Amino acid sequence: MKFNRIFLIVCDSMGIGNAKDAKKYNDFGANTVGHICSICDGLNIPTLQNLGFGNLGDFKGVAKTQNPQAYILKLNEASNGKDTMTGHWEMMGLKTEKPFITFTDTGFPKEFIDLFEKKTGRKCVGNIACSGTKILDMYGEHQIKTGDWIVYTSADSVFQIAANEDIIPLEELYHACQIAREIAMDDKWKVGRVIARPYIGTKEGHFTRTSNRHDYALAPFSKTALDSLKDAGLDVIGVGKIPDIFVDQGITRKIKTVSNEDGMNKTIELASDNFNGLAFINLVDFDAVYG
């Protein structure tokens, strides 16, 4: 069967239960959708239910169906890793054998932080594995007073830099991320991504991350299906952070989004566009706003 257009939509970080290797990453029991359903006393998602979403697990309020209107299945990663790049690259046929370096338990080495501070002219606070919302409550007011960078990591291979847009200009934040990316090209610190995490707000409990996030990723180490599609003369439209994840490799057109709703509205608009190929969409709010 041949399709002129394919829409691949990734609900970033919206998991339906832990994977087979969850214990390896201390993620056993993870189930974002299941927990949302429980806290909200069930979800009313009739369209997804008819497609067969309820058949993927036990989700309160979402019934299973005997005749789903779509093909449904669960996937487990074959790659060695669990971060954004590893997962998205594997979707496009690129299996990662050697996981990216993580600093979850230790934070980044002093040598790395010292070099970053010297090159950017600002001190750092944080340097721990932490939720992106929690770290702002911990250090947001401190940054307003001092102008220090808030840096942190996670279970993923990332160096994240948070900056209040009213204190540190966006361009300075982006430049600092480029500096961090250059430093982190050293094999001993080679993380998968450096991420700019701008936010606004003035006091604990009222900080909000903005849509001006930007990822500085390593390029895929080999060709992906995106390259094959592009080389075949087909359209490859990256929506949201997809172009960042692949460092524009194999992408023919980029569409920026500011939220999940904006991402879906732009995807709906694309349905009226007479392109021929793939629209690859990432809905990032589950991670960027709530992660």
Residue map of PLM features:
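Active-site glycine-rich loop that binds ribose-phosphate moieties when present
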Residues: 131-135, 171-179, 217-221
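Beta-strand elements within well-structured catalytic alpha/beta cores of enzymes
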Residues: 3-17, 91, 229, 277-290
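Charged, low-complexity intrinsically disordered tails and linkers
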Residues: 160-191
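Active-site nucleophile/metal-coordination loop of metallo-enzymes that catalyze phosphate/sulfate
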Residues: 13-147, 152-164, 168, 197, ...
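Alpha-helical scaffold segments in soluble metabolic enzymes
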Residues: 35, 87-90, 115, 138, ...
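Structural signal for hydrophobic packing residues in well-ordered secondary-structure cores
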Residues: 40, 56, 120, 143, ...
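Anion-binding catalytic surfaces of enzymes that hydrolyze or transfer phosphate/sulfate esters
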Residues: 145-153, 157-158, 184, 188-291
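Gly/Ser/Thr-rich active-site loops/lids in small-molecule metabolic enzymes
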Residues: 37, 173-177, 260
